[in-house]
Amino acid sequence: MLTNPSQVIIRNQDSLSQHKVLVLNHEADLLPKALLDVAASVDALALDYHHYLHLAPHANTKLRCYFGHDLPHQDPLEREKYDTVIVYFPKAKPLAPYLFNLAANHLVPNGQLLVVGENKGGIKSLVKLLPEYFATGMKLDNARHCLLFGSSLEGSAPAMKLSDWVSQYQLTTPQGEISICNLVGVFSEKRLDLGTELLLSHLPTLSGRVLDFGCGAGVIAAALLKAQPSLSLECVDINAMALASCELTLAANGMTAKVYPSDGLAQTTGKFNGIISNPPFHDGLASTTSIAQNFVTDSAKQLQHNGIWQIVANRHLPYSDIIAAEFGQLKVVADNNKYKLYYFQHK
């Protein structure tokens, strides 16, 4: 089943006949595979690891699938070129200019840019957002509650440098001052959010192998290693920009950890002495609650004897029931008017 934006692309796929196509920020469907009905070849870059895992089993000689903030093994001066680049307009609007710059670096001169997105997702401002090296965006289709815009590469775009897309700032935590590197599209308030502050204010003493689930830009990871530098820390997230941010944050603080993508805990292995998280489960949507349920169930299985599990969660959502059902006895170590901090030790 194709998502609504993908269905709009299929409605307009004739313009891709025999093209070498690059799809950026694709969704959890098989649109890149479907485009092979008309395109000569398709490369697809997912910024969400779940989306990558959905498509990757279908890779073949004409369909290459990648995950990350950029295509791998690219010479900055000799990037691979495509006749058409399709961009799915990102949910995090600040990520859009990054994707347009990446698209421009991979287009042949006068190559075709297609941008698709849901009406409610910010794409209506596309014409204002397109950099000057692209022709004025033209509306090509309006269907399935989505818009499709087309443009072409008219000028030369700045070379892609990750450092151009990072904001770095100092953050005061209960563990001391840390440097945070935040790439576009990664959540940041440039101060400790209430949930993370609650967690860091009651950070347990840990040892051995510890997992930071949903690491984001690495705030918890850096604070944890500042206080307890001997930990063997692993940081996982589903978002490519978050993982790259976390790596930059750790490097800026002279710290090391294993940073890698994981869909839930599926890509982690073995058991942990500690699992710490401010998980991205705060919106109360059914799909998010399901992810939370899986995280709690899986993390219970991956906790060592005497291991410590501590997460902060929105007090108004039913995660306390999910957690209690899995762990039985657990403590609410602290709370504020928005969050509760849950603690469990595997005896």
From Swiss-Prot:
GO terms for cellular component: cytoplasm. It is an enzyme of class 2 (transferase). GO terms for molecular function: 16S rRNA (guanine(1207)-N(2))-methyltransferase activity; nucleic acid binding. Its main location: cytoplasm. It comes from the Bacteria. The keyword Acetylation does not apply. CDD domains: AdoMet_MTases. Keywords: Cytoplasm, Methyltransferase, rRNA processing, S-adenosyl-L-methionine, Transferase. Monomer. Belongs to the methyltransferase superfamily. RsmC family. Specifically methylates the guanine in position 1207 of 16S rRNA in the 30S particle. This is Ribosomal RNA small subunit methyltransferase C. The gene is rsmC.
